[in-house]
Amino acid sequence: MSANIFSEGQKISARGEDFLISKVDTNYDGSFLLYAQGISELVKGKSFVFDTNIDNEISTVDPTRTRLIADIDSGYRKTKLFIETQVRNSFIYSEKITIAPKAAFNLAEYQLTPTLKALKLPRPRILIADGVGLGKTIEAGIFLVEMMKRGKGKRIMVLALKSILAQFQQEMWNRFAIPLVRLDSEGISRIKTKLPTNKNPFEYYDKTIISIDTLKNNAKFRHYIEKSHWDIIVIDECHTVANEESQRGDLAQFLSQQCDALVLTSATPHNGRKESFANIIRMIEPTAIPRSGDYCKADIEDYYVRRFKNDIEDASVRANFRDREIVRLGTQLTEDEIDFLQYQQNLKFNALAGIRQGKTQNDYLFSIGIFKAFLSSPKAALASINSRIEKVKTALSASDDLGDNLSILIELKSKLENILSKNADSKYHKLKETLIELGWSGRLHDDRFVLFAERIDTIKYLKENLQTDFNLPDESIAYFHGSLSDVEQEDMIDDFGKKDSRVRIMICSDAASQGVNLHFFCNRMINYDIPWSLITLEQRNGRIDRYGQYKTPYIYYLVAESDIPGLKTDLHIIERLTHKEEEAHKSLGDAGSVMRLYNQKKEEQFVVNAIKKQDEGFLEKHDGYEFDFSVLFGNDSDKTLPLITDQPYETPLSIYPQDDLFYRDLFEQLISSGQVSGSELKENSPGYIELMNTPELNEVLFDLPPEALPRINDIFRLTSDKELVQKAIEEARKRGGEWAKFQVLYELHPAIRYYMSKLEASVDKDIALAARSAVFPAATAWFILHGQVSNDLGQPVISDFFVIGVKWDGSLVQSLFYSMSS
């Protein structure tokens, strides 16, 4: 074939199917490599490479050979449908919101800002750093569907914490009809049975969701991603990858180079160090940070959004947030607890005296460690002491540290065992008393509670005692911690979010404090112990105090009380954290900006030092820290505005006044032409359609989540009524293991795309439908053309429809082209 007949943007036919050339490379022998996107029914949406030296039957689609065939349908229905389908399947170029309003969520304009901001950038990349509970997952979904509508969201990978893979996957499907294949341990096992050993799952499945730890720890997956490229990568809770020297950070930096668009989300996007935050910004835009590493707000403001609840001005949106109620449950320590803590205080004072004499801090840190463990529970403190005793017994030699003094450890152990044997745990008694006062007995109609505790030993201790004291079956209390497998975590979170769950109390470690939705059917949370980090405390409280909580969130703190000097101060320092978190919640919106350390471990150390100095005013002092990020994010002048344009929406081109009319005509046409049988499709009412999952459709939709795909001969229920879809989501939460029965009816739904491609296929590529209309001037013909220019990846950068009027003599009407979109 001649060398000059192939060019980018050209349509070709090969092996009986049609393709659009996105790139042309010259082979060593003068032949060509044609990179192409499939556009006919069987290959639509897939990428191919043709070697003209091998495929010598490639022909170009010649528009001059097009035959005009009269549309004889009533009202030219087929012509209208063909034009509308072409328009809906085409990609648009716009800096405004076009398709997201059709998805199933309550639209709040502040949620549009990340996408609007990203669309203005040469590469759409954005950090969504909104505060806890503002709906960052919805904001990410808006970005994804808008990019898909622009032809830049075919291949998507989402990285999330293993505990929320299923939660994120459901949100994307239920609200946006984005099918993400979940690659947790169960999903990986499933695809191993489907794919050959050497098959790259990221090439087989276009849209996936996986834990970054799975990628990090699986050498084969690392090999796969090195050979893959994505249109969009989403990294949820991106603060976990901020350290580029860690395995996670190194992997995230690599992945940021394997995609075009990038979305990072985190309510705590930095740890207070400029270098750490610069690592995140460099993933978004490497040139944003000056080479010197010294940057300011002006350098990075295009690449992030950050708002808090207090910044949301729309009253209708604020109504989705309920004002929380704080309940402090003071617990008077028992004599046995006081005896233990006085012993601990003596150890602390002796250690402080030793520090003044030049000794190390080891003894002080040991005394604080057992204090912190005891504030979680006597059981947790006993587990720590027992572990220490075993280490000392097996050590070849002991040091002079208190923690290595066997007699001290045995004395501590004896006092803790005494507390437990006498059932003298005042905090547990207060918890039990509070539950009884609230009328709670663990029955199915009783309120659900989330309990947070730092130590796994405390979690197990609480489960055992609550089950015994309330005579509860094992299924009534669940406990969640980081040692559970990804599937166990997903199943537990999913079950607790269902109305028919039998779990009445879910006891969680801080592994559940990030990103997990626990507010469905639960509005009561108890901090059984108080974390020594405001960031952790804020994240805990945000599990039930978040967007979409329809009841008043009740947050309980169990606070130990004592009048013993020294101990009283230590306990008051810990209690001050709860007051300061509440102050920050009401005013700043960001608890991390109080200490300005932006790192849980650093905040815990800050509290340790406050106890050492007996400084009850430690939370009022902020001087001397390296990087005051509140200057960047906290002040009014730095906050992202709810909208960055007065008119954020652009209505997509359509020749149908309502979507419902288009879908009605589409399915009537497919049935009347015999392309599908009447039993496959059923329009129950305007905007509500039932589609049977036929063997053919099931094969096309192979990459849908198994939970979302009906069995063969069962039905999809699609509706344009967003309220109905949202009710279906709520109904699904009432029953374990179910996804929403209704799905959103719009052109991005995979099943709808399949039926629109069938309509397109009903008109041969060398045919153009012709229709008569009295609205056009006499002796003229008007042609509708679609023009598209793509980049090297096959992504459209220009796409528009034009109407060209031609007179009988061949001249243009007024020599003008009319853009349909304008």
Predicted regions and their residues:
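SF2 helicase/translocase NTPase motor core
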Residues: 41-116, 120-124, 136-139, 145-248, ...
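Inter-lobe coupling linker of SF2 helicases/translocases
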Residues: 197-198, 203-204, 209-230, 241, ...
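SF2 helicase motor core recognition
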Residues: 218, 272-273, 507-522, 541-549
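A short beta-strand element within the Helicase C-terminal
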Residues: 229, 276-279, 516-529, 554-557
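Conserved Helicase C-terminal RecA-like lobe
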Residues: 321-332, 369-505
